[in-house]
Amino acid sequence: MMALYSFSTDLRIRCAADYKSVFDGALFKVHQPHFLFLAKLTEQPNSRLGIVVAKKKVRRAHERNRIKRLARESFRLHQPKFGSDIDVVVMPKVGIETITNAELYQQLDFAWQKLQRLAKKHSKVVPTSQN
């Protein structure tokens, strides 16, 4: 039986200050052909997701909604696998509306796996202060 994971409000980046924090202090950047992921470690008890889909990048509202829906669903399924708590902002690139849902989901899957590897590697490297 597959585990059910929710996507409650505490798993979302909601305020502008939190988005700014990720944009200004991103420790990890993951590039895919149609996505850019920015991420940083957080003090929050959970990993959180923010999605920025500008009209300039994706003109049609139904395409913006499709991208956001797939990004949320993908995050919801991958979030329990993160080794540490991170804030992630997902930004689509120009031309994303031309690819299918399957291709989009595959790119998201690759990006989450790469982000998980980077976060685990970083958590092993960070020294603890001994004063």
From Swiss-Prot:
E.C. designation(s)? 3.1.26.5
Gene3D superfamilies with a match to the protein in the record: 3.30.230.10
User: What does it catalyze?
Assistant: Endonucleolytic cleavage of RNA, removing 5'-extranucleotides from tRNA precursor
InterPro entries found in the cross-reference section:
Ribosomal_Su5_D2-typ_SF, Ribsml_uS5_D2-typ_fold_subgr, RNase_P, RNase_P_CS
Output the Gene Ontology terms for molecular function.
3'-tRNA processing endoribonuclease activity; ribonuclease P activity; tRNA binding
Cellular component aspect of the GO annotation: ribonuclease P complex
Pfam assignment, any one: Ribonuclease_P
For this UniProt record, the keywords arranged alphabetically read as follows: Endonuclease, Hydrolase, Nuclease, RNA-binding, tRNA processing
Report any one BP term from Gene Ontology. Answer: tRNA 5'-leader removal
Task: Describe the task this protein carries out.
Answer: RNaseP catalyzes the removal of the 5'-leader sequence from pre-tRNA to produce the mature 5'-terminus. It can also cleave other RNA substrates such as 4.5S RNA. The protein component plays an auxiliary but essential role in vivo by binding to the 5'-leader sequence and broadening the substrate specificity of the ribozyme.
Concerning PANTHER family, the annotation shows: RIBONUCLEASE P PROTEIN COMPONENT (PTHR33992:SF1)
Per the record, the similarity remark reads: Belongs to the RnpA family.
Q: Quaternary form?
A: Consists of a catalytic RNA component (M1 or rnpB) and a protein subunit.
Q: What is this protein called?
A: Ribonuclease P protein component
Q: Which organism is it from?
A: Acinetobacter baumannii (strain AYE)
